[in-house]
C-alpha cells in the first residue's frame, strides 16, 4: 500500500505516537550533557544532567502523556506532541499550543477523509476514526 506519511500514520496507530522526549528518550550533547531533546540543547536551555552526575529531570512526570491533560484524551495519534514547542508557546511542557493542536487535528481529519474514501473500496474496513466537528481540542474542553 502507498503511504502518505502523516495521513496514513494515523490509520495504523492505536495510541499516541509522540516523540516521548523527557519520558523515554533524552539527548546527549557533544559536551556530554543531557537535554530533554535537541531543540532544548540548541535553544541553550539548562541541561538535565551529564555523563558524570547522571540524569536529573525535575518534575519528570510532566513529560509523560498521563500528565498531559489535553493530550491524554486526544486521538490525533500522529501528533508529535513536541514538548519544546509546548514550552515555547505555553511555558508548560505538558500543554500544547493552539497551532500544534490545530495542525495535528487538520492532519487527523484528512486521515479520516482518506479512510472514508479507502473504505468505499473495501480497504481498511476494520479501521475506525471518529468524525469530529472541531480542530482545536480546547474548543471541546470549553463546551
Please annotate each region the language model reported.
Residues 1-31, 44, 96:
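Radical SAM enzyme [4Fe-4S]-AdoMet core and its adjacent flexible, acidic
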Residues 1-10, 37-89:
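C-terminal accessory region of radical SAM enzymes
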Residues 16-18, 22, 61-64, 91:
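Generic marker of residues within folded, mature protein domains
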Residues 23-25, 29-31, 66, 71, ...:
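Active-site lining segments that contact anionic ligands and/or coordinate catalytic metals
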Residues 73-143:
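Radical SAM enzyme core and accessory elements
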Amino acid at each position: 500500500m502507498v503511504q502518505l506519511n502523516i495521513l496514513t500514520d494515523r490509520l495504523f496507530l492505536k495510541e499516541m505516537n509522540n516523540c516521548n522526549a523527557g519520558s523515554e528518550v533524552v539527548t546527549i550533547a557533544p559536551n556530554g550533557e543531557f537535554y530533554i531533546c535537541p531543540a532544548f540543547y540548541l535553544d541553550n536551555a539548562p541541561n538535565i544532567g551529564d555523563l558524570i552526575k547522571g540524569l536529573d529531570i525535575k518534575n519528570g512526570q510532566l513529560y509523560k502523556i498521563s500528565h498531559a491533560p489535553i493530550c491524554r484524551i486526544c486521538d490525533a495519534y500522529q501528533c508529535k506532541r513536541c514538548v519544546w514547542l509546548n514550552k515555547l508557546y505555553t511555558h508548560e511542557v505538558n500543554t500544547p499550543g493552539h497551532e500544534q493542536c490545530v495542525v495535528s487535528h487538520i492532519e487527523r481529519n484528512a486521515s479520516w477523509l482518506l479512510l472514508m474514501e479507502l473504505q468505499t473500496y473495501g480497504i481498511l474496513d476494520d479501521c475506525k476514526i471518529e468524525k469530529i466537528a472541531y480542530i482545536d481540542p480546547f474548543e471541546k474542553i470549553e463546551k
